Amino acid sequence: MYSLETIGQNKRHNPADLSSPPTVLLLLLSLFMAIVSGKSTASDTDQLASTMPKLVVQITVDQLRGDLPMRFRERLGEGGFRYLLEQGTHFNNAHYRHANTETAVGHATLVTGADPSRHGIVANEWFDPQTGESTYNTEDDRHHLIGEKAKTHQGVSPRNLLSSTIGDELVLSNAAKSRVFSVSGKDRGAILPGGHAGKAFWYSKSSGQFVTSTYYYDEYPKWVADWNAGKPTERYRGQQWKLLQPRETYFARDLDDREYEADFGALGRTFPHGYGDDKYTNLVVGLTPAIDELTLEFAKLVLEKEKLGAGAVTDFLAVSFSATDYVGHLFGPASLETEDNILRLDRILASFFSFLDETVGLENTLIVLSADHGAPEAPEYMQSIGLDTGRFDFDHFKQPNPLSAALLERFGRNDLILAHSHPYLHLNYIAIREAGLEPSVVERFVAAEAIKLPGIAYAMSRSELVDGQYADAPIQRQIRRNFHFDRSGSVHLVQEQYWFLHSTDEAAKMGLAGLAAIHGSPWVYDTYVPIFFAGHTVPAQKIDRRVSPTDIAPTISDYLGIKYPSGNSGNPLSEVTRARTITQ
């Protein structure tokens, strides 16, 4: 096997002297006979299979904005991000093309190559005005968690994902010989990347175990049951998340206690952060770097017990690390907590790559790493350096407000806004019909009035999107790519740069007064993510041209010689696929 120091240099020792005349003649004769016969033999097929990676590992780091690996580069260890930066292909200018940069949306895009308008995951949840209920992105009442009773809105599966995924296409390409698994600290971070044909496991903040639903299994495999029986979170009970390095070595050493940071139970706002020793311990573990440690441990177990990468065809493993997102939400990207988390994530990646090298071989593994979205700094932090920012609370619409007053004045009713769910306002179409109003007129009026609210930059109605009556400008195109006729809301809101659209009610459900930072906009800080390809035959190079995460799925597909996912709208990255063609 190749070491971490040599993988990516693409050097292969060949004892044959290909420059000698007899060798050249033999090669030409063999090529001529192959062309004349027009047939492939079993050995040809075996040889082709041997050039394919044995394993594809697609890593998603939740909320890893594109600049973060470079920001802390001088502090990184060996074998983690440094391996990707120095021995992989790094696309340094990658941006999502859709407007709602939320977790579920990004994860779906990464594995389908599709925009939300095609894969259908337009938000973390969407509202159905006919039923008056919200639908979670992976909700499926038919499939409850194994070992639990079926409950409304509690079952999960990939049913809502409308496009096939890379893993699905891999399984379809070889009569289901490939195996596909997905692991994450979040359900959506596992279920969506696992696709329809894979198996998904995710961390439960209530039980402290890795769980799955009856969509995947009737009962837990023994190795999963055994691992959960070991009570993996007990090691953190009563312990603390302490700084990995001396405080004076951190860039953000003075950014540890700010009033806008979330303050939750034993976790607190300052180092050392406690995990607690009560009923909330499993929850706190799931919000800190500890969840990435558990995710890595479980992912290694999947590789070992399912023998991924050991068969005759390519297997696929998706791993989504969630801690960066939770830490960013609680403390903000410009915080001591985020810096320490990145250093810990770097160690996690180094451990993972080393394990892959020992078990499958990095020369046999295609590694892909990206993120589901970026993130802004906290508004209060941006205000401290002179930017005009603020927070716009969606719950504002539950109270008398300028928008409801404008509706009352224009249409004689103030009950025309039914609900909100980021980034949408949902209108009360029953009330609109009762009043004899034209829905498109009300939609466009609400959009026009919403722009007058402080912190709102753009608002587009669904009627504008359906009719195609909008300016062909970047923000409008991003909103259009996010629009799905059956799932998108009545009006799509876009906040001013560095303003937040949020809901204090949603934060309250987590026992928090609020969150430090919230993503979900079409602005660059939210769309900007890294894209790395490494291992196998991938060369070391840095690419500065603008690309999109929609390009990842078709690149992997081309690399493996399989068809693109059904909803794909991206293009293969030639810097990666060309190197693969040359080595073949």
Identify the meaning behind each predicted range.
Residues V24-I35:
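Bacterial N-terminal signal peptides
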Residues S43-T89:
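Active-site-proximal N-terminal segment of extracellular/periplasmic enzymes that hydrolyze or transfer
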Residues V56, V171-L172, K177-S184, A190-P193, ...:
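Active-site regions of oxyanion-processing enzymes, predominantly non-cytosolic
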Residues P69-R118, R179-V183:
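Short, structured active-site-proximal loop/turn typified by the sulfatase FGly-forming signature C/S-X-P-X-R
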Residues L76, N93, E102, N124-G155, ...:
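Secreted, luminal/periplasmic, and some membrane-associated catalytic domains
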Residues I191-K199, H273-L283, L287, A310-L345, ...:
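Active-site His/acidic residue clusters
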Residues Y236-L296, K300-L301:
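Long, low-complexity, polar/charged, intrinsically disordered or flexibly structured peripheral segments
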Residues S384, D388, F392-L437, G514-L560, ...:
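Substrate-binding rim/cap in mid-to-C-terminal beta-strand-loop elements of soluble/periplasmic
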